[in-house]
Amino acid sequence: MFMSSFIMAIDQGTTSSRTCIINQAGGLVAEAREAFKQIFPKPGWVEHDPEDIWYSTQRSMRLALEKAKIKGSQIRTIGITNQRETVMLWDAKSGKALHNAIVWQCRRTQDLCEKLKKNKKEKIITAKTGLVLDPYFSATKIQWLLKNVPNAAKKAKDGQALAGTVDSFLLWKLTAGHSHKTDVSNASRTMLMNIHTGWWDEDLLKIFGVPEAILPEICPSNSDFGVTQGLGFMPDGIPITGIVGDQQAALFGQTCFETGDSKCTFGTGSFLLLNTGKKAVKSKNKLLTTIAWKLKNQEMTYALEGGAFVCGAAVQWLRDGLGLIQQSSDVEALAKTVDGTDGVEFVPALTGLGAPHWQPEARGLICGLTRGSTKAHIARATLEAMALQNVDILNTMQRDLGKKLRGVRVDGGAAANDLLMQMQADYCGANVVRPQNLETTALGAAFMAGLGAGVWKDLKEIKRVWKVNKEFKVKMTPKARKERLQRWAQALERV
């Protein structure tokens, strides 16, 4: 075993870049975060400056090393996880961005998607990618950049421009332009990769008008992606051996390695992924079929993905919009002052309904109010709604997979809320497991890189490193669960 078994996990997110130093025991040694600017040029448009992404990433790397009180030479390997779908175009020689990055939230390509739907392209796109035709994914974003950025199409044609998701841009920068690669999980979100072959698809490239030459090489998630060069604060030659998209990284960080394992990340929204093993399960309910990861010399591992638009954001709204609580963490104590909601239901469709309903025009609803209703009832109804909308997604996943869940592993900020976690277990009828380390996205990148570099020799060794904080066992009877889910379904019908 190497003396220096520290792993650096870069977690490049939507609002900040973060670096975690993880030790061989899977423990968090140090963490540093650097926020960066959000750019909104027009309503519905969201951009990031690629130089901000790169600067904030470097700064978080330096700060994490300082906090850990270690030198860059003590890093055994680097793993990268990142906001998915966000895409950029840069000069192949200088590395200078040709335009701001177009962020996953950006809706500017809605018209391009509608045009493709009218031209009957949706069926072939979904069959090859497992995705729904939507501006969320990278393909129409790259198409927009090539059409609208001066000289971009010519530079692309002449081999003078490169395109990629955030992971491939960071890799290119970390290796001083020597490596233009991505992993299967990130590539599966571009809408340009065939998830059944694991490579860029000729038909899709033609549909979106993207030349293959500008795209990175697709690799297994624990590949030898390249080595550091020219960073200054770290020596040259440190290997980068893990890349995985953020939600897939959380699935891996939760050691959801078996078919039927699932994780739920409680963030602004909630993200649920279910490991479907070697089979790309086609959803009958508009869930996304995606690649979880591919390990070297192994078959692809697939997943089903669904998300609710509003999760923690509902609690923020109670705080900022209604003024019911002073800080988000107060919601649990307030909700505990009552035994139930006393008939109050809250459907938090504040920005529409996500999976499995897909009603972007839907708006939020609080119903069942009486003179006896208090802010505590509304607080409790909010927590119940957060759990119930996840149940809708989990039940849909079970139907698509054709087998019962093996339990749910949870992470993200709201996973620290014991009352919410017990509700989640009761309403989905499966035990909920919370790990000691809730930063599972960074941990997933560290596990992947460690696997690639030989810090851990296999998935069994990684499983031994993963530690449980608490398991929430089902307490609710099947009859009570059925009645509660019926009341929720009735509230949804009123939205």
UniProtKB/Swiss-Prot annotation:
<keyword id="KW-0547">Nucleotide-binding</keyword>
<feature type="binding site">
    <location>
        <position position="316"/>
    </location>
    <ligand>
        <name>ATP</name>
    </ligand>
</feature>
<dbReference type="Pfam" id="PF02782">
    <property type="entry name" value="FGGY_C"/>
</dbReference>
<keyword id="KW-0808">Transferase</keyword>
<feature type="binding site">
    <location>
        <position position="247"/>
    </location>
    <ligand>
        <name>glycerol</name>
    </ligand>
</feature>
<feature type="binding site">
    <location>
        <position position="18"/>
    </location>
    <ligand>
        <name>ADP</name>
    </ligand>
</feature>
<keyword id="KW-0319">Glycerol metabolism</keyword>
<feature type="binding site">
    <location>
        <position position="85"/>
    </location>
    <ligand>
        <name>glycerol</name>
    </ligand>
</feature>
<dbReference type="GO" id="GO:0004370">
    <property type="term" value="F:glycerol kinase activity"/>
</dbReference>
<feature type="binding site">
    <location>
        <position position="417"/>
    </location>
    <ligand>
        <name>ADP</name>
    </ligand>
</feature>
<dbReference type="InterPro" id="IPR000577">
    <property type="entry name" value="Carb_kinase_FGGY"/>
</dbReference>
<keyword id="KW-0418">Kinase</keyword>
<dbReference type="InterPro" id="IPR043129">
    <property type="entry name" value="ATPase_NBD"/>
</dbReference>
<feature type="binding site">
    <location>
        <position position="312"/>
    </location>
    <ligand>
        <name>ATP</name>
    </ligand>
</feature>
<feature type="binding site">
    <location>
        <position position="14"/>
    </location>
    <ligand>
        <name>ATP</name>
    </ligand>
</feature>
<feature type="binding site">
    <location>
        <position position="15"/>
    </location>
    <ligand>
        <name>ATP</name>
    </ligand>
</feature>
<dbReference type="InterPro" id="IPR018485">
    <property type="entry name" value="FGGY_C"/>
</dbReference>
<dbReference type="GO" id="GO:0006072">
    <property type="term" value="P:glycerol-3-phosphate metabolic process"/>
</dbReference>
<dbReference type="GO" id="GO:0005829">
    <property type="term" value="C:cytosol"/>
</dbReference>
<keyword id="KW-0067">ATP-binding</keyword>
<feature type="binding site">
    <location>
        <position position="136"/>
    </location>
    <ligand>
        <name>glycerol</name>
    </ligand>
</feature>
<dbReference type="InterPro" id="IPR018484">
    <property type="entry name" value="FGGY_N"/>
</dbReference>
<dbReference type="InterPro" id="IPR005999">
    <property type="entry name" value="Glycerol_kin"/>
</dbReference>
<dbReference type="GO" id="GO:0006071">
    <property type="term" value="P:glycerol metabolic process"/>
</dbReference>
<comment type="pathway">
    <text>Polyol metabolism; glycerol degradation via glycerol kinase pathway; sn-glycerol 3-phosphate from glycerol: step 1/1.</text>
</comment>
<dbReference type="GO" id="GO:0005524">
    <property type="term" value="F:ATP binding"/>
</dbReference>
<feature type="binding site">
    <location>
        <position position="268"/>
    </location>
    <ligand>
        <name>ATP</name>
    </ligand>
</feature>
<feature type="binding site">
    <location>
        <position position="268"/>
    </location>
    <ligand>
        <name>ADP</name>
    </ligand>
</feature>
<dbReference type="GO" id="GO:0019563">
    <property type="term" value="P:glycerol catabolic process"/>
</dbReference>
<comment type="similarity">
    <text>Belongs to the FGGY kinase family.</text>
</comment>
<feature type="binding site">
    <location>
        <position position="246"/>
    </location>
    <ligand>
        <name>sn-glycerol 3-phosphate</name>
    </ligand>
</feature>
<feature type="binding site">
    <location>
        <position position="14"/>
    </location>
    <ligand>
        <name>sn-glycerol 3-phosphate</name>
    </ligand>
</feature>
<feature type="binding site">
    <location>
        <position position="85"/>
    </location>
    <ligand>
        <name>sn-glycerol 3-phosphate</name>
    </ligand>
</feature>
<comment type="function">
    <text>Key enzyme in the regulation of glycerol uptake and metabolism. Catalyzes the phosphorylation of glycerol to yield sn-glycerol 3-phosphate.</text>
</comment>
<dbReference type="InterPro" id="IPR018483">
    <property type="entry name" value="Carb_kinase_FGGY_CS"/>
</dbReference>
<protein>
    <recommendedName>
        <fullName>Glycerol kinase</fullName>
        <ecNumber>2.7.1.30</ecNumber>
    </recommendedName>
</protein>
<feature type="binding site">
    <location>
        <position position="246"/>
    </location>
    <ligand>
        <name>glycerol</name>
    </ligand>
</feature>
<feature type="binding site">
    <location>
        <position position="413"/>
    </location>
    <ligand>
        <name>ADP</name>
    </ligand>
</feature>
<feature type="binding site">
    <location>
        <position position="136"/>
    </location>
    <ligand>
        <name>sn-glycerol 3-phosphate</name>
    </ligand>
</feature>
<feature type="binding site">
    <location>
        <position position="413"/>
    </location>
    <ligand>
        <name>ATP</name>
    </ligand>
</feature>
<feature type="binding site">
    <location>
        <position position="84"/>
    </location>
    <ligand>
        <name>sn-glycerol 3-phosphate</name>
    </ligand>
</feature>
<feature type="binding site">
    <location>
        <position position="84"/>
    </location>
    <ligand>
        <name>glycerol</name>
    </ligand>
</feature>
